[in-house]
Amino acid sequence: MNGIVSRLSALSKAGLGLAAGALALIILNLALPGSSLFFPLVSLWLDLALFLLALVVLRVAGVELDLFHRAVLAGVWAAALLYAFWALGSRTFVYHWDYANYILKQYSTEAAFLQGAGVGFRFVFDSITEDYTNFISLFTEFPFCLSGKTGDDYAFCQVFSILPTLLVLLAGLVLKAGQMLRVKNRFWYFLMGLGWCITYPWLRMSAMLGQPDWFGLIFAFSILLLTLDFRFEKLDPVRFVLLFSATAAIILSRRWYLYFVVGYYFSYALLVLVSSIRTARAGHRHPAFVQLRNLMLFGLVSLAAMVVLLWPIVRHILSFDYADRYSYYNGGGMVTEIYQQYARMGLMNLVLIGMGLWYSLKTRKMPALPCLAGLEILLSMLLFTRVQTTGSQHMLLFLPGWFLLFLLGAAALAEGITRRRNLKIGFWLFTIVFATSVRCSPLTLVALPDFLIGRTVLSASPQESARDFAAIDDLTYDRKDLPQIQAIAKWIDTHCAEGEISYMIPHNMLYCPDHFKNCLLPETPINAKLAFGFSVPGVHAFPMQFFEAKYVLTADPFPMAHVNDPENEMSHKLNDLFLAVRDQYFKQVETFDMGNGTTFTIWERTAAPTRAEVDYYLSGFAQEDALYPEMFSQVAEAWLTGHGL
């Protein structure tokens, strides 16, 4: 037996170890159902299994990490650890909106697994049709379970649970592109290529804000590694299983990665088709036929299997009009999106890409690579902008294409490193330092470090001047009003008994209910005592909890910080309606000075809601009601009927 084990490869031994671990987890669950150890150990097992699968992907792709590569990766991971510790420790950020979704889901998934393994896995499975699934929660529990479980802890723990696997696959992608480009100076190419990719601000942006969406890039990079130089010359079952699994996993991680999947596979199929045509023209018709046959066979079987496996997601996509419901987030279509893509790239990265394209054209090395990357980016952009304009987290779905273009630039510099060596190394180091210093804020629109925020018109949004934008960015990224926010949260907790609620009208980046709900994480004492809020047409339903609330909170001046569409944003409309009739139904009971020019006022309801009051507020949203009656008048009528009004 020992002889058999000794003859196994390292990957095979690791696989046996994982199998033994899975058996131990089954025994633990049977012996101690609902154990608090089960979910963290499952998460650790999944992280190790995913890392092992990443190594399998590298082997199938024909990529090997030698001692030099492994040493560089260890150094990069250590630097990332220090960076995350510094970046998270140098700010006071209150997790809200999308930035709080994952940590709250992590709490909920933990609670589900404490009820038993079956309950926990069912909780994860039942979420697959939601915009935010619980799939990633399976991988981020360890080592989060060992931390203080704050929002910053959740962001920091991704360096352990996600980054190692992501780094290995990114390094593999760098090497694979280098193989295809036949780079001779592999030392500088690897350092430059990996350095530019790993320090690109939008790779880490969402992670530093509590959104582990970069988890999906593990599977995106796997797809690239398995396809870039594969032309379906033969049937490769192992490669096909890995491709199918990576595609399913990336869709489960975040549904909007579908735009990458569709854009990339279409571009890749076109590349294989062109390759087959060229092969046929060269007189090799049978190999060309085999390529197309294998491509179609894999594509059709995979598509059918994917529809069956992910039918709940497919059904939800087909039945839900995202373009209509998310129209508020569509801030200008393709023209705006192109501008944002270039703004997020930054001048130096655009120069780098330009050098890579010139290098590819000049040397005629792998013209298919920039064509594949460019077409994937363009198609994904066209598909995405039919629904909305990208936020910082959505930038991740374009990174595989952009990174391929980065690597072209790295190859161009590395191959000519002997000429103007110091200048080129200086350019590389400067861009890395500049990229590392970029502020990871919800309002970061352009890749600029702290000292340039507000000092250039490039940082201004369409709604604010550069100076105002910088002020808002400072207020939201590094909160100086946390004591006041916590004071209001404690006031609500004290004055609202079980079953009673408060309603907060402001709902924007500066102040929204989530700031007050999540200001004491991991404790959420007012989660059931403060209503969610109301702001986005097509997403937020008419707020009947406003009429049920014991207290209503508003602010003066009313916050309208960096809202997407000021004219159609709904919280300020609700506030205007409230101020016009507040004295008929409410009395002022408390005020809070937030220390930044904003004052919160708390109003207590003194008169029971009536049909006339509901109709008055509903009349202020006639336009929205005409578009979404099921979210306005129908909701109001059902509430009135249920309350005998």
At which residue positions do the language-model features occur?
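Start-transfer (signal-anchor) and selected internal transmembrane alpha helices
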Residues: 1-86, 290-301
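Transmembrane-helix motifs of polytopic, lipid-linked glycan transferases
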Residues: 56-60, 156-184, 222, 355-362
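Membrane-proximal lumenal/periplasmic loop motifs of glycosylation machinery
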Residues: 89-100, 114-138, 157-160, 205, ...
